[in-house]
């Protein structure tokens, strides 16, 4: 493999691993904050216990997110020196501000973990709130660099030189707010569904322990409710993202929908696989006129097809499958939430059948898969550009050798880290079962 493929594989693996912990690092604090708020309002000890236990998991995940994020930053400089030269001169603000966001998160996380029992109820909520603010701000700031890659602003390249630099224009690039909303909303969704998966699993294991079962049922319903809300909000934001693609990255939208010919009243292709030879999406379900309407809220909107662009600037055509998988996961998770809430609140069922709990157990893995598909779609769909229509990925890759060795090394490191996280979480929660916390709360 050439250096470009190896460099993209290495950095893609790093980001694919890091994004799991970064996403949960934003999503779990919201769950902790909501549990704290419910506890302070109702004085139901179950919610205080939820907040306490989820905080332990958050601490472990944060401990992995920090080094993997550092590795990702280092690899940016090592693998993409030409890209970082532009970022250093034009888009350094997010990295600088993110340092403060990280310190806010780390400071208040330490306060909440080590001094929660000595804080007043109001200060407990304040501490968790700033953990959430710091985590969300970090995610938004770093993801803003990705937004800048797709909708660059605040500089020009003339005769190979960077001129007319405006850091704030680069920071508030056209897709900043939409991208920021998408990353935060999807992180909240994922954090909730991970909790739902664990709660569903524990409900299956504790069917004969009524007190523990009720505790996990509350956690499940809370998680499904929050997950459902943010799944819906993520979907609405995704619609805005598609309209942004229509305006700023039309070939990416065409690739996502498998549209080859420019046309009005363009259909929306659901499912299927893009065939580059026949220039169509095979075995797809087409909804007439829907793509034109989704692109600009008019059925007669003209949507550019791939053939309107040079073939060497087409994104990989498999992004149609990634896009459909991402959307499909989101719709499935909304359905999960509706079923769970209806079963408990409308049908008034005290017990969930095992088959339904098994389905709910898949919510967390599906949400993470959706995050991964979305991230790969966002980055791969921008190719061959690293900065859209200004700088190609192949022009900024390092010429240093040994990338293959680094790829194998870091893959091994991530496997070890992943196994260590699973081991530590299982070890801690087996040593500290819910029964102990419930007994302490009742004594």
Swiss-Prot record:
UniProt topology in membrane? Multi-pass membrane protein
| Cofactor binding: number and manner | Binds 1 protoheme IX group (heme b).
Name any one GO molecular function.
Answer: oxidoreductase activity, acting on diphenols and related substances as donors, oxygen as acceptor
What is the native source organism of this protein?
Bacillus subtilis (strain 168)
Cellular-component GO terms for this entry: cytochrome complex; plasma membrane
Record function comment: May have a role in sporulation. Can compensate for the loss of cytochrome aa3.
| Keyword Oxidoreductase belongs to the record | yes
This one is known as Putative cytochrome bd menaquinol oxidase subunit I
The record's gene field reads ythA
The cofactors it requires, by name, are: heme b
Knockout-associated phenotype: Not essential.
Q: Where are the transmembrane segments?
A: 19-39, 60-80, 93-113, 125-145, 176-196, 219-239, 322-342, 357-377, 405-425
Which protein family is named in the record?
A: Belongs to the cytochrome ubiquinol oxidase subunit 1 family.
Which residues of this UniProt protein bind heme b? 182
Does the entry feature the keyword rRNA-binding, yes or no? no
Q: Which UniProt keywords apply?
A: Cell membrane, Electron transport, Heme, Iron, Membrane, Metal-binding, Oxidoreductase, Sporulation, Transmembrane, Transmembrane helix, Transport
| GO-annotated biological processes | aerobic electron transport chain; sporulation resulting in formation of a cellular spore
> Which Pfam families does this UniProt record tie to the protein?
Cyt_bd_oxida_I
Q: What class of enzyme is it?
A: oxidoreductase
Entry's EC annotation: 1.10.3.-
Question: Where is this chain's protein located in or outside the cell?
Answer: Cell membrane
């Amino acid at each position: 493999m050439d250096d470009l493929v190896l460099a993209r594989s290495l950095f893609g693996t790093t980001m694919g691993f890091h994004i799991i912990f970064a996403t949960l690092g934003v999503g779990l604090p919201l769950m902790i904050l909501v549990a704290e708020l419910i506890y302070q309002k109702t004085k139901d000890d179950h919610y205080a216990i939820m907040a306490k236990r989820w905080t332990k998991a958050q601490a472990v995940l944060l401990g992995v997110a920090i080094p993997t994020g550092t590795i990702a930053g280092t690899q940016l400089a090592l693998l993409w020196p030409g890209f970082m030269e532009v970022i250093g001169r034009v888009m350094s603000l997010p990295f600088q501000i993110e340092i403060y966001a990280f310190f806010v998160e780390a400071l208040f996380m330490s306060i909440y973990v080590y001094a929660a029992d000595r804080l007043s109820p109001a200060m407990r909520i304040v501490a968790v709130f700033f953990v959430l603010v710091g985590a969300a701000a970090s995610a938004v700031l770093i993801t803003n660099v990705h937004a800048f890659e797709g909708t660059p602003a605040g500089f020009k390249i003339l005769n190979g030189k960077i001129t007319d630099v405006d850091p704030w224009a680069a920071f508030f690039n056209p897709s900043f707010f939409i991208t920021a909303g998408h990353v935060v909303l999807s992180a909240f969704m994922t954090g909730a569904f991970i909790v739902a998966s664990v709660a569903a699993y524990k409900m299956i294991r504790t069917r004969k322990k009524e007190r523990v079962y009720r505790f996990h049922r509350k956690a499940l319903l809370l998680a499904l409710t929050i997950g459902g809300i943010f799944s819906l909000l993520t979907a609405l934001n995704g619609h805005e993202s598609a309209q942004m693609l229509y305006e700023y990255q039309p070939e990416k939208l065409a690739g996502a929908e498998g549209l080859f010919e420019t046309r009005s009243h363009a259909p929306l292709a659901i499912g299927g696989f893009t065939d580059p030879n026949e220039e169509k999406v095979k075995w797809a379900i087409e909804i007439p006129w829907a793509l034109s309407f989704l692109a600009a809220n008019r059925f007669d909107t003209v949507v550019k097809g791939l053939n309107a662009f040079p073939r060497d600037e087409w994104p990989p055509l498999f992004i149609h499958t990634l896009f459909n998988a991402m959307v499909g996961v989101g719709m499935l998770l909304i359905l999960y939430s509706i079923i769970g809430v209806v079963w408990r609140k409308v049908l008034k069922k005290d017990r969930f059948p095992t088959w339904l709990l098994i389905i709910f157990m898949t919510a967390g893995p599906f949400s993470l898969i959706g995050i991964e598909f979305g991230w790969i779609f966002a980055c791969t769909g921008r190719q061959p550009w690293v900065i859209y229509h200004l700088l190609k990925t192949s022009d900024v890759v390092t010429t240093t050798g040994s990338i293959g060795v680094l790829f194998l090394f870091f893959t091994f490191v991530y496997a070890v880290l992943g196994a260590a996280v699973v081991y530590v979480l299982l070890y801690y929660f087996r040593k500290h079962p819910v029964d102990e916390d419930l007994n302490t709360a009742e004594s």
